[in-house]
A protein has these predicted regions:
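Twin-arginine (Tat) signal peptide motif
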Residues: 1-7
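Intrinsically disordered, low-complexity regulatory regions of eukaryotic regulatory proteins
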Residues: 3, 21-22
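Binuclear metal-dependent hydrolase catalytic cores
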Residues: 7, 11-14, 23-219, 298-325
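N-terminal signal peptide c-region/cleavage motif recognized by signal peptidases
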Residues: 17-19
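Cap/insert and terminal regions of metallo-dependent hydrolase folds
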Residues: 207-209, 215-220, 225-316
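A polyampholytic, Gly/Pro-enriched intrinsically disordered region
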Residues: 327-333
């Protein structure tokens, strides 16, 4: 093929146009709703790890794709799971520790850039000061203000925007932010999220936990939390409880640390008292993420809690309807 023909072929290819979630919905039959599932994007901690990214979870339900927390590395896992930033419709944050929200910027900017004004604004929910954080990131005078201005005003960026299906004048990224507190209930198309209290690092950060209920089942996520009656009440009777499991019981640095983060024996009691069907352990430190230690923790939990216990892994997908677990991609090493 001559170089001129090759260039003409590249210029005419539609590959630069990114299908959006709205396109997918329009093309799909009305009954083609996604069954409720949750994918563990990041099951690690703030500590560096090549195996476990920081906190992030992806829920598929109906026509919506919801992320709960989006820490460093979570967005990479989202792409590995077969999803795109433009697929995400809602983002919820339990608290604003960096290991739970650092990829928020990547999600918003990549979704805005690839979506080319053809996707609805991202719905964002989180504790204060999520609104101020959003403005400081994406506002005119925000951290990414000069980047956003360049992508809106430079001719080359405008050309790329139009190639992706956009129509000038390009809008700024404008996440629709709602600050939430304990007791809030957010309703979607066939789902409802209830906001509960998490016991972690108050009063310096407001810390929340979430529960989603649908006709197919229920999932509760503690965020970061030590042992508290609030989690027992929020998780009552749910199909899946995803709980922080930071330490082996007795190895916490201090009593204060235990109250903020808990341990595996605390989690066993919470799961039992809440009457959940499945307990998923996450936010796992390297000191316990080892052969024999993992098995010992699961065994000791099962001495108290008689439901299913799952050692969470990045890219593990769970469906509460049948308690089925599948790995999207096996962890290396």
């Amino acid at each position: 093929m001559e170089r001129r023909e090759f260039i003409a072929m590249l210029a005419s290819t539609p590959a630069v146009t990114i299908p959006t979630a709205a396109d997918d919905q329009a093309a799909a039959p009305a009954a083609a709703l996604k069954p409720l599932s949750i994918t563990l994007l990041g099951t690690g901690t703030p500590s560096p790890s090549l195996d476990r990214q920081s906190s992030g979870y992806l829920i598929e339900v109906g026509h919506d794709v919801i992320v709960w927390d989006h820490g460093p590395g979570a967005h990479h896992r989202l792409l590995q799971s077969g999803h795109r930033s433009v697929d995400v419709t809602h983002a919820f944050f339990t608290h604003l520790h960096y290991d739970h929200c650092m990829d928020y910027g990547r999600l918003v900017l990549q979704r805005w850039d690839q979506g080319a004004d053809r996707v609805a604004d991202l719905q964002v929910y989180g504790p204060p000061p999520i609104a101020r954080m959003t403005e400081q990131l994406f506002g005119v005078d925000g951290i990414y203000g000069p980047d956003i201005r360049a992508r809106i005003e430079h001719k080359s960026s405008q050309d790329q925007f139009e190639a992706r299906g956009g129509k000038l004048q390009r809008r700024r990224p404008a996440p629709k932010v709602t600050e939430i507190r304990v007791g809030a209930v957010i309703s979607g198309d066939g789902w409802e999220v209830t906001v509960g209290h998490a016991q972690h690092v108050e009063p310096y950060l407001e810390c929340l936990a979430f529960r989603i209920d649908t006709s197919e089942g229920s999932i509760c996520y503690t965020g970061d939390s030590g042992p508290t009656e609030a989690i027992v009440e929020l998780a009552k009777g749910c199909d899946i409880l995803i709980h922080m499991n930071h330490y082996f019981s007795g190895t916490e640095p201090s009593p204060a640390y235990r109250m903020a983060c808990g341990n595996h024996r605390d989690n066993a009691v919470i799961a039992k008292r809440a009457g959940v069907k499945t307990l998923v352990l996450t936010h796992l430190l390297g000191q316990i993420d080892r052969p024999s230690v993992r098995e010992l923790i699961v065994h000791e939990i099962q001495e108290v809690f008689k439901g299913k216990v799952i050692w969470g892994e990045d890219l593990m997908r769970l469906t509460p309807a049948d308690a089925r677990v599948s790995a999207i991609e096996s962890r290396q090493g």
